[in-house]
Design a protein with these regions (language model features):
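Gly/Ser-rich oxyanion-binding loop with an adjacent helix/lid
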Residues: 80-168
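Short beta-strand segments
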Residues: 6-7, 35, 177-181, 274-276
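ATP-dependent small-molecule kinase catalytic core of the GHMP/sugar-kinase superfamily
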Residues: 131-251, 255-269, 288-300, 306-323
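Solvent-exposed alpha-helices and their adjacent loops that cap or buttress functional pockets
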Residues: 24-25, 34-37, 141-143, 166-172, ...
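ATP-binding N-lobe of GHMP and related small-molecule kinases
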Residues: 1-100, 117-124, 296, 308-323
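Short beta-strand-to-loop capping motifs
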Residues: 47, 60, 180, 283-287
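Short cationic amphipathic helices and targeting signals
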Residues: 273, 278-285
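Short beta-strand scaffold segments in enzyme catalytic cores
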Residues: 11-15, 33-34, 41-46, 140-143, ...
Length: 323
């Protein structure tokens, strides 16, 4: 009863903040994202009747507190679905920096859900596995189905699940990651956004935003898709930063990258910025222009990586297990 899985993190296109049901992690509205590769999380999980307690390790460190509670929510749900009560040994490793705004919880919980479901002997489709991953992170649901994916809002697992959007953009997109160090806490951001006086205004337009994004992505419209993602980043930030704590999570280098992107665009380069929760920046462009864009972002004084569109979460061979 052991399995290993791999999943890619996500960049939000139409993002979400705020949870209608925190236990089931049901969001207030739909969301759309794209997976970024080769960045990934790998997880090995084994249900073992000889263990006295669950063991959770991420990047070589034992997980405790709220992090352990979130993993346990996924583990316990899999136990319930499989009708087993064995304790689990769980180990995960990330190939990219975590907690700086690049979707590590998405890839982590997506890989965890895939590995746990396989280790428990369950036969589930990826949309079904996405409902398991959602118990740890809504973004993880979209990382399970990969590529450009749409998590639909709903009242339960029958309808709140992820589906992939087929698009020609998967071959064209290149993402330059501008890494701006600044620890972030997504759960706090959910609470801040929902308490903002601007949250109702965001809810009023988000459904039209989702419909427009789906149409642009399905039609392979690069500029329309990522202009929308850029605007949505600003909308999300405005909502989150006007919560009770007045939390400003951007750093000076974040703004510098924004301005550099707009200068490139004024020079007819197809390029748009996007941010989730954190100071780091996704800079979306095409294969033709990626070298020029990366050089410009690096000139802002940050480390960079270049990513492509990542596929769905998948089971790996036993030879790749972490233990």
């Amino acid at each position: 009863m052991k399995a290993t899985a791999k999943a890619h993190p996500i960049q939000g296109i139409v993002k979400y903040h705020g949870m209608r049901d925190e236990e089931l992690r049901l969001p207030y509205h739909d969301s759309i994202s794209v997976c970024t590769a080769p960045s990934h999380s790998k997880t090995t999980a084994a249900f073992d009747p000889e263990l006295d307690a669950d063991e959770y390790v991420i990047d070589g460190e034992a997980v405790e507190g709220r992090g352990a509670e979130r993993i346990a929510a996924v583990v316990d749900h899999v136990r319930e679905l499989a009708g087993i009560d064995h304790r689990v040994r769980f180990e995960s490793a990330n190939s990219f920096p975590t907690n700086i705004g690049f979707g590590s919880s998405a890839s982590g919980f997506a890989a965890a859900a895939m590995a746990l479901v396989e280790a428990a002997g369950l036969d589930m489709t990826r949309p079904e596995v996405s409902t398991v991953a959602r118990r740890g992170s809504c973004s993880a649901a979209r990382a399970v189905t990969g590529g450009f994916s749409h998590l639909k809002n709903g009242m339960n697992d029958a309808d709140c699940r992820s589906e992939r959007i087929e698009t020609e953009l998967e071959d064209e997109l290149r993402v330059v990651a501008g890494m701006v160090p600044s620890y972030k806490e997504t759960e706090a951001a959910h609470e801040e956004a929902a308490a903002s006086h601007m949250f109702e205004n965001r809810m009023a337009h988000i459904h039209g935003q989702i419909a427009e994004a789906r149409d642009a992505i399905a039609g392979g419209e690069f500029d329309r898709t990522f202009e929308l993602a850029e605007h949505d980043s600003l909308s999300l930030a405005a909502t989150t930063m006007t919560g009770p704590a007045g939390w400003v999570y951007w750093q000076p280098r974040t703004i510098e990258i924004f301005n550099a992107v707009r200068e490139l665009r004024a020079a007819d380069v197809p390029v748009y910025f996007s941010v989730d929760t954190g100071a780091s920046v996704y800079v979306n462009t095409t294969a033709e222009y990626v070298d020029r864009v990366e050089e410009t972002v690096a000139d802002c004084g940050v480390d960079t990586r270049v990513w492509e569109v990542g596929g769905p979460a998948r089971i790996l061979d036993d030879s790749e297990a972490l233990f």
